[in-house]
C-alpha cells in the first residue's frame, strides 16, 4: 500500500485555473464516492478550498493510483489528464506525509501560518470518514496531522502576528484602543483593499462600521453585502467628529483627509483619540496630522514595518514547526509498519499455543491418571516455556517496525517459523470492498 497526494495549489496553477478545479461543497460527498469506486483506490480524502484542490489516497500501486486520481480530476472538471498533470504536483510516501503535515499546519499557505486551513482539513477528513472512504491508515494519519497542527499553533506564535496590510491596520488600532468591540470605524474606499479592511474590522469584533466612497452606489453594494452602513464622501467631516478609527484606501489624486479638516474636528472631539490609517498609494491622508493631540496617523510604510517584523517572526516559527515534521513522519512509518508486524506476532502466538494445546492433549492421553492440580501445573509450565521461547522472536519482530526493509524481513520471519500471517494489504482491500458496497447501497436507497 502506498500514500499518494496530488495537489493543485497557488504554486502550480494561477487563480483562473484554480477556480475551474474547485469542488462545490454540495458535490464533495459524491466526489469522494466516485473516486472510491475506482479499484486502485483503497482510501481517499478530498480537500477543496479557494486556494487548493487536493486528493489524498492510499493506493495499491503508485503509478496506477496516480493515473486514476488524475483521470478523476480531469473528468470532474472537463480537462484532459495531461492538463491535470501540468497544473498539479504529485507527492508519494514520506513526501506525501510531509505535504499533509505542512498543509494542515499552514506552512504551505499563501499567508504563512494561517489557521483556516486546519479547520478545512478537519472538515475534509470528517466528510470522508462519514462518507466511508477512509480506513485504518487515514483514520490514524489525519488525526495525527490535525493534532500536530494544533500543537504547532499552540506552542509557537506563527498565527499571532499580522502579515497583511489590511490586517496590520486593525492591529495598529488595537495598540491604541485595546479592545475594539465598542468602537466606530469608517472605511474610505469600496475597492478590494477597502473590503479587506472591512472584513478585518468585523473580525476584530466591531459591528459599527460605515463605508464611505466617492461613488455612493459602490459603497451601498459593499455595505449591504456585509450588513454595515454607508455614506457619501461629503459626509466624511461630520463622521470624523464621532468616529474612532478611519482606514482609507482610495485611488484619489488629492488628500481625502487634510490637516485643516482634522484641526477643525479635533476641537469638537476634545480628548477622544482618533486613529487614522492610510493604506493608499499615493496617500489619502495629509502628512503631519499626528502632530495634533490625540490624533494617531499611520501610513503604508508604518504598516509595512509591522508586517515585515511579523513575517520574520512567522518564518522563525515556521522553521521550528518544519523541524518537527521528520519525527512525525518516522512516527507514522513506525505505526504503519506495525500494521504488518502485529498479524505476524499474532500468527506466531497462535501457532505456539496450538502446539501447547496439542501437547496437553497428548499428555492427557498418555497420562490419564493425572489429577486436575497436576494437569494445571503442567499446563502452566508448558505455557511459560512457550512464552520464554517467544520473548526474543517477538521483540525482534516489533523492532522490524522501524526497519526500512520490514516487509522483506517479515516474510523471512514467517518462513523461518512456518507461519502465514494476515496480509494488511489484502485486509485493506477487503475492508474497501465492504465499505464500497455500503456506499452503493446507501446511494440506491437514497435514490429510492
Curated annotation (Swiss-Prot):
Keywords for the protein's UniProt record, in alphabetical order: NADP, Oxidoreductase, Porphyrin biosynthesis
Chain positions recorded as substrate binding sites: 49-52, 109, 114-116, 120
S-S bridge residues: none
Biological process according to GO: protoporphyrinogen IX biosynthetic process
Catalytic reactions of this protein: (S)-4-amino-5-oxopentanoate + tRNA(Glu) + NADP(+) = L-glutamyl-tRNA(Glu) + NADPH + H(+)
Residues at which NADP(+) binds: 189-194
InterPro entries: 4pyrrol_synth_GluRdtase (IPR000343), 4pyrrol_synth_GluRdtase_dimer (IPR015896), 4pyrrol_synth_GluRdtase_N (IPR015895), GluRdtase_CS (IPR018214), GluRdtase_dimer_dom_sf (IPR036453), GluRdtase_N_sf (IPR036343), NAD(P)-bd_dom_sf (IPR036291), Shikm_DH/Glu-tRNA_Rdtase (IPR006151)
Top EC class for this record: oxidoreductase
Pfam family, one: GlutR_dimer
Active site: 50 (nucleophile)
EC number(s) stated in the UniProt entry for this protein: 1.2.1.70
Pathway: Porphyrin-containing compound metabolism; protoporphyrin-IX biosynthesis; 5-aminolevulinate from L-glutamyl-tRNA(Glu): step 1/2
The keyword Transmembrane is annotated on this UniProt entry: no
Swiss-Prot/TrEMBL site (Important for activity) positions: 99
Gene Ontology MF term list: glutamyl-tRNA reductase activity; NADP binding
Protein purpose: Catalyzes the NADPH-dependent reduction of glutamyl-tRNA(Glu) to glutamate 1-semialdehyde (GSA).
Annotated HAMAP family: Glu_tRNA_reductase
Additional comment: During catalysis, the active site Cys acts as a nucleophile attacking the alpha-carbonyl group of tRNA-bound glutamate with the formation of a thioester intermediate between enzyme and glutamate, and the concomitant release of tRNA(Glu). The thioester intermediate is finally reduced by direct hydride transfer from NADPH, to form the product GSA.
Family to which this protein belongs: Belongs to the glutamyl-tRNA reductase family.
Assembly and interaction partners: Homodimer.
Domain remark from Swiss-Prot or TrEMBL: Possesses an unusual extended V-shaped dimeric structure with each monomer consisting of three distinct domains arranged along a curved 'spinal' alpha-helix. The N-terminal catalytic domain specifically recognizes the glutamate moiety of the substrate. The second domain is the NADPH-binding domain, and the third C-terminal domain is responsible for dimerization.
NCBIfam families: hemA
Protein name, per record: Glutamyl-tRNA reductase
Amino acid at each position: 500500500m502506498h500514500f499518494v497526494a496530488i495537489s493543485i495549489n497557488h504554486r502550480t496553477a494561477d487563480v483562473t485555473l484554480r477556480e475551474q478545479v474547485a469542488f462545490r461543497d454540495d458535490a464533495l460527498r459524491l466526489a469522494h464516492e466516485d473516486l472510491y469506486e475506482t479499484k486502485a483506490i483503497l482510501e481517499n480524502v478530498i480537500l477543496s478550498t479557494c486556494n487548493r484542490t487536493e486528493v489524498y489516497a492510499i493506493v495499491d500501486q503508485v503509478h496506477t493510483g496516480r493515473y486514476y486520481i488524475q483521470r478523476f480530476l480531469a473528468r470532474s472538471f472537463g480537462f484532459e489528464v495531461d492538463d491535470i498533470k501540468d497544473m498539479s504536483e504529485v507527492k508519494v510516501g514520506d513526501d506525501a506525509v510531509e505535504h499533509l503535515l505542512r498543509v494542515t499546519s499552514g506552512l504551505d499557505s499563501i499567508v504563512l501560518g494561517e489557521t483556516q486551513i486546519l479547520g478545512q482539513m478537519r472538515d475534509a477528513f470528517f466528510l470522508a470518514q462519514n462518507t466511508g472512504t477512509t480506513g485504518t491508515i487515514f483514520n490514524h494519519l489525519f488525526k495525527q496531522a490535525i493534532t500536530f497542527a494544533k500543537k504547532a499553533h499552540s506552542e509557537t506564535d506563527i498565527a499571532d502576528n499580522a502579515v497583511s496590510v489590511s490586517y496590520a491596520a486593525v492591529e495598529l488600532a488595537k495598540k491604541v484602543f485595546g479592545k475594539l468591540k465598542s468602537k466606530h470605524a469608517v472605511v474610505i474606499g469600496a475597492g478590494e483593499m477597502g473590503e479587506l479592511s472591512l472584513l478585518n474590522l468585523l473580525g476584530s469584533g466591531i459591528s459599527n462600521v460605515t463605508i464611505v466612497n466617492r461613488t455612493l452606489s459602490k459603497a451601498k453594494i459593499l455595505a449591504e453585502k456585509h450588513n454595515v452602513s454607508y455614506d457619501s464622501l461629503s459626509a466624511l467631516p461630520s463622521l470624523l467628529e464621532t468616529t474612532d478609527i478611519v482606514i482609507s484606501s482610495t485611488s484619489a489624486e488629492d488628500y481625502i483627509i487634510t490637516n485643516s479638516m482634522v484641526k477643525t474636528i479635533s476641537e469638537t472631539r476634545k480628548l477622544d483619540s482618533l486613529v487614522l490609517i492610510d493604506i493608499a498609494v499615493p496617500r489619502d491622508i495629509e502628512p503631519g496630522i499626528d502632530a495634533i493631540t490625540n490624533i494617531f496617523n499611520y501610513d503604508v510604510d508604518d504598516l509595512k514595518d509591522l508586517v515585515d517584523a511579523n513575517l520574520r517572526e512567522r518564518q522563525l516559527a515556521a522553521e521550528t514547526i518544519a523541524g518537527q515534521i521528520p519525527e512525525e513522519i518516522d512516527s507514522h512509518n513506525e505505526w504503519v509498519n506495525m500494521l504488518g508486524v502485529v498479524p505476524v506476532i499474532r500468527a506466531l502466538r497462535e501457532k505456539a499455543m496450538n502446539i501447547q494445546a496439542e501437547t496437553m492433549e497428548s499428555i492427557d492421553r498418555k497420562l490419564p491418571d493425572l489429577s486436575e492440580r497436576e494437569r494445571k501445573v503442567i499446563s502452566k509450565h508448558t505455557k511459560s516455556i512457550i512464552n520464554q521461547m517467544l520473548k526474543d522472536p517477538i521483540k525482534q519482530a516489533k523492532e522490524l517496525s522501524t526497519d526500512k526493509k520490514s516487509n522483506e524481513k517479515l516474510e523471512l520471519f514467517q518462513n523461518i517459523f512456518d507461519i502465514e500471517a494476515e496480509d494488511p494489504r489484502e485486509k485493506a482491500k477487503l475492508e474497501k470492498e465492504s465499505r464500497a458496497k455500503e456506499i452503493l447501497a446507501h446511494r440506491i436507497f437514497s435514490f429510492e
